[in-house]
C-alpha cells in the first residue's frame, strides 16, 4: 500500500495530506494494518472485517470452504489464524470508521468491539441491524455514510 500512497502523493492534482484507506471484508483488516504502518494515512474505514479470521474455516459451509484453499494454501485454518490485528490496532492513531451488518455471522459486530477496544485513535462504529456480509443489501445507505464521514474527517 505504501507504494500506492507514494504514487498518489507524488501527483500535483491530488492533496497528499488527505489520504484515506479503506477496505471491505479482508480488505478492512489490511486497511487498518496500513494505517498503523504508514503515517501519511489520515483516516481509515473498514466494512465487515475481522480482528482475526481465525476459526472461520471450520464454520464455513461446504460450498465456501474449498475455495479457501485457493486463497490460503494447503492449510487455510492455520493461515487464517496467522492473520490478525493483535499488536497492530494500538499503533493506528487516525480516525477509524467501522461499518457492520447485524445479520452477518461471518464477521459479526463483535469484531468491531474488539478492534475498538485496542485501536489507538478515535473510532466510530455503525451497525445496520439487517445488514449482511459486506452490506450488499444496505449499500444504498452505507456508501453515503462512508463518503460523508470521509469528507468530514479529512
Task: Provide a role label for each language-model segment.
Residues 1-13, 33:
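Alpha/beta-hydrolase active-site loop
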Residues 32-78:
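Hydrolase active-site cap/lid region
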